[in-house]
């Protein structure tokens, strides 16, 4: 198998609504050699990856995939690769991974192998190891071009993968918080490779670092980290704490020991996880040795009175005791046969034990502390303990040093509960681990004694979510409920705008409407990321990384995200779901790139945000491919947009109570109207929207309708929608490269980024309407600077020229700055040839390769009353060229409002007749168009 491409998707994508990895592979000879015809292959594979027995595949029960491997000729290697990658991730600890699919690509023997992942690095590594294993098990003649490693050690590689996965995985505490958030449908983002996690989006977000939250006070952490100060602060309010001294020298330690009296505890001033702690000391020699051990972790050392009793961790969250665990130091139990060292090995065989915090329990170690306790007990590592004898190889019950935990939450005495809550409140911690020593947690400390030895600002949750004995406690849920109280939002409203043409203008319109409504808008477009109207990052920012940048910004109250085809194909959507999503149109552009060759395939890509939107999808009812997307949507509402007031399906949809935005004709113009739940809301006359050039720019009329429909679905007030549309203009500063009009010395220039046939057609139609209506006062010749991106299909470049042919007096054909794989003059020459083929005289056409020179030449040719349309690639440079020729922007006459048309949807209008092969589907959202599976 040869890998042609590797790609990972971070959100909803063409294959699934969750993260997946895709390997594109060429099977070569394996295309004709499925699993069952390769001698010994299946047995060797199942022996190496026994987890495959659990895969049901098409049979839906364990063992189903093994049947597929053996039955008839078996199954193909791409399918096997998919299942092995899933099984290896499961073995590496990614237990939720179960999804996979293998689909043929365009070429014979080439397949897309797709499978789910939890952690991207682990998913990729599992894929690579799966390939190596399959190549190792297959005969060399079936793997031409693949270098075989004669020393390949699969189990060794698998162990490396497991260890690497454990290092990269979220720790037990952080992982439990993430799971609790997912259970509450709260989105989360991992902000680094460790334990920094963001819950929620934008202004609604909260963050955690392990179990420290964004609500945790810094001064409280400082106090809890200072053991001496903690002891003093708690003692000052009458809480039970041991007497304590801080020392820096051995002689000071001995003097403090005499004052306190034996037995004693010696511990570092500011260490954690039980490091350097020695308890139950009864001699000066033990104190000196313990002092020096503690000095390895802290310059200052604490001595305190020893409190007898069991070690308990009491977890307080938001001033409530949520869990208590009795911590038992790491120990072994003799059996009369094994040595202590062998008993330690036996304990470490427990699959719950791992290194550090990677699992719910930590491995035991025979280190210096264990040796001290062995010596104190008169034992060595080779001692055989009598059956039933318990020997502690740790003096503290920390889980990080091999201890175990017993849940005792339900038996805690009320006095002890109140004491723990007071301790956390005294220091000021929202999440606090109270280390409390007492002989019996079910009896009051006031009766039998006890004391608080420490407070922890970042307490571990392992002992509570997965105790060795007793009931697991949802302590992570308590933290998430504190950060996001009941009914508190965790998401900001998200709008996703996709389609072929009009995305950027619609995105900017919608963002402007929200800004007028008082929101702090985060916006992604093809020219950059904007936060509250200010450019934050420049460039094409329409992919998943850009979306996440906006959603991470804590100042943003609403996210308006332009969603382009490229980002969806490369990495997916980048977040779980938008509230509102729209598809403006599906038109010929980018075909022949990244495996997308037809408009129907392009529609599948554009449909991704539509499928996952939660509240409303807004679809172009005048585009059949957009119309068909509605049936795939799970959103609560479907809103259609149409320029045709007699659209039969939309009228039927409105009669059913569905949502729509329609263009209605009145006596003095055209009115944008909103229909929702039986209501008819006249919104705004099109000639009052500056971006439409008095209603002449129909593509911007449509963009305004989409912006209005989305804003209405997002709960924006009608007056704010009207105000936003009336104050949005297509100036260079509000919408660069989107129908920017400039008046220079008596002639007009229109600058646009149109780069496909549909966009060029829209602008040429606008020019026709403007000239016909004399809206810009132009009566001279028309000039067009024409170009097309080099990575488009030949037929698309030809079509671009064809739609412009015959509509201008002169043409200047240029290329974009980047030829995108074509010769320097190839695109301009193709445009010229296509113009001439469409009837344009050669004398009307000029070839100027450089965009900069082409624009200068066109500007020089313009005279009084002329109109120049420039399709530019480098928008900012071209705009500078234009403004250097003159000043003054086109002034538009004040529009005169007309009477409300008062158009209504007639009850007796004929029903919509679906096209052949399709059918009408009705549900609570209105009327939808779907494929008729039963049609011939």
Positions of the model-derived regions?
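ATP-dependent carboxylate activation and anion-phosphoryl transfer catalytic cores
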Residues: 1-183, 320-323, 328-335, 339-342, ...
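Conserved N-proximal alpha/beta basic substrate-recognition cap immediately N-terminal to
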Residues: 114-259, 272
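Residue-level signal for inorganic ion chemistry
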Residues: 181, 435, 524, 562, ...
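Active-site nucleotide/adenylate-binding loops and adjacent lid/helix of ATP-dependent enzymes
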Residues: 206-368, 414
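Flexible active-site lid/hinge loop adjacent to a nucleotide/diphosphate
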Residues: 535-653, 688-693, 757
């Amino acid at each position: 198998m040869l890998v042609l491409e590797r790609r990972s998707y971070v959100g909803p994508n063409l294959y699934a609504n969750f993260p997946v990895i895709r390997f594109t592979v060429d099977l070569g000879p394996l295309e004709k050699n499925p699993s069952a015809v390769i001698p010994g292959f299946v047995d060797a594979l199942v022996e190496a990856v026994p987890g495959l027995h659990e895969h049901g595949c098409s049979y839906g029960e364990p063992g189903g995939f093994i049947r597929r491997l053996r039955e008839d000729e078996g199954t193909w290697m791409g399918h096997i690769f998919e299942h092995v990658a899933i099984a290896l991730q499961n073995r590496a600890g990614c237990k939720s991974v179960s999804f996979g699919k293998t689909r043929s690509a365009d070429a014979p023997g080439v397949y897309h192998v797709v499978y789910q992942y939890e952690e991207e690095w682990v998913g990729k590594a599992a894929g690579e190891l799966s390939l190596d294993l399959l190549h190792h098990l297959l005969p060399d003649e079936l793997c031409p071009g693949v270098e075989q490693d004669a020393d390949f050690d699969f189990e060794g590689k698998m162990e490396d993968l497991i260890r690497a996965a454990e290092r990269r995985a979220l720790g037990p505490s952080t992982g439990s918080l993430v799971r609790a958030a997912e259970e509450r449908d709260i989105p989360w983002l991992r902000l680094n490779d460790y334990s920094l996690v963001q819950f929620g989006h934008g202004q609604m977000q909260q963050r955690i670092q392990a179990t420290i939250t964004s609500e945790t006070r810094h001064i409280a952490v400082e106090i809890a980290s200072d053991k001496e100060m903690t002891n003093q602060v708690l003692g000052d309010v009458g809480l039970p704490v041991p007497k304590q001294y801080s020392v820096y020298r051995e002689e000071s330690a001995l003097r403090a020991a005499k004052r306190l009296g034996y037995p004693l505890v010696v511990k570092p001033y500011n260490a954690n996880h039980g490091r350097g702690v020695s308890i139950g000391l009864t001699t000066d020699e033990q104190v000196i040795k313990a002092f020096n051990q503690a000095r390895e972790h802290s310059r200052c050392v604490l001595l305190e009175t020893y409190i007898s009793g069991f070690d308990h961790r009491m977890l307080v969250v938001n001033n409530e005791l949520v869990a208590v665990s009795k911590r038992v130091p790491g120990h072994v139990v003799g059996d009369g046969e094994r040595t202590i060292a062998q008993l330690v090995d036996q304990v470490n065989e427990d699959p719950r034990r791992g290194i550090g915090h990677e699992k719910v329990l930590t491995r035991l170690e025979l280190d210096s502390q264990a040796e001290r306790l062995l010596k104190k007990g008169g034992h060595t590592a080779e001692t055989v303990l009598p059956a039933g004898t318990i020997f502690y190889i740790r003096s503290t019950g920390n889980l990080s040093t091999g201890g175990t935990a017993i849940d005792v939450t339900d038996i805690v005495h009320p006095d002890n509960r109140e004491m723990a809550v007071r301790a956390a409140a005294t220091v000021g911690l929202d999440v606090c681990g109270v280390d409390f020593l007492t002989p019996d947690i079910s009896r009051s400390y006031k009766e039998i004694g006890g004391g608080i030895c420490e407070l922890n600002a970042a307490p571990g949750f392992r002992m509570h979510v997965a105790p060795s004995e007793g009931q697991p406690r949802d302590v992570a849920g308590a933290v998430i409920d504190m950060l996001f109280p009941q009914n508190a939002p965790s998401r900001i409203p998200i709008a996703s705008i996709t389609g072929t043409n009009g995305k950027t203008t619609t995105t900017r319109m919608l963002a402007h409407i929200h800004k007028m409504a008082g929101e702090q808008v985060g916006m992604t477009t093809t020219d950059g990321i904007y936060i509250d109207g200010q450019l934050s990052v420049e460039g094409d920012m329409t992919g998943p990384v850009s979306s996440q940048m906006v959603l991470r910004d804590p100042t943003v109250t609403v996210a308006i995200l332009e969603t382009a085809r490229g980002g969806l194909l490369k990495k997916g959507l980048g977040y779980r779901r938008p509230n509102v999503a729209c598809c403006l149109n599906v038109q010929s552009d980018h075909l022949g790139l990244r495996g997308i060759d037809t408009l129907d395939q392009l529609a599948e890509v554009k449909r991704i945000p539509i499928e996952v939107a939660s509240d409303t999808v807004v679809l172009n009812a005048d585009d059949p491919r957009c119309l068909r997307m509605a049936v795939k949507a799970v959103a609560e509402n479907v809103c259609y947009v149409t320029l045709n007031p007699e659209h039969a399906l939309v009228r039927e949809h409105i009669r059913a109570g569905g949502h729509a935005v329609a263009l209605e004709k009145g006596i003095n113009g055209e009115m944008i109207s909103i229909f929702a739940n039986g209501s008819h809301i006249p919104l705004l006359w099109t000639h009052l929207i500056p971006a439409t050039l008095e209603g002449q720019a129909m593509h911007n009329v449509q963009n305004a309708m989409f912006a209005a429909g989305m804003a209405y679905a997002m709960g924006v007030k009608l007056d704010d929608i009207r105000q936003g549309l009336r104050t949005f203009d297509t100036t260079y500063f509000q919408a660069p490269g989107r129908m920017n009009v400039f008046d220079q010395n008596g002639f007009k220039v229109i600058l646009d980024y149109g780069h496909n046939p549909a966009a060029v057609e829209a602008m040429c139609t606008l020019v026709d309407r403007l000239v016909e209506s004399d809206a810009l006062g132009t009566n001279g010749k028309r000039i067009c600077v024409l170009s097309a991106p080099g990575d488009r299909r030949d037929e698309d470049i030809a079509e671009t020229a064809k739609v412009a042919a015959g509509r201008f007096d002169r043409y200047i054909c240029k290329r974009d700055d980047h030829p995108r794989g074509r010769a320097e003059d190839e695109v301009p020459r193709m445009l010229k040839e296509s113009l001439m083929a469409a009837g344009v005289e050669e004398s009307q056409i000029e070839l100027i390769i450089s965009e900069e020179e082409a624009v200068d030449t066109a500007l020089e040719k313009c005279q009084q009353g002329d109109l120049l349309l420039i399709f530019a690639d480098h928008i900012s440079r071209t705009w500078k060229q234009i403004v250097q020729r003159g000043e003054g922007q086109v002034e538009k006459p004040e529009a005169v409002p007309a009477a409300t048309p008062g158009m209504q949807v007639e009850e007796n209008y004929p029903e919509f007749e679906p096209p052949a092969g399709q059918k009408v589907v009705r549900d609570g959202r209105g009327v939808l168009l779907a494929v008729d599976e039963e049609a011939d």
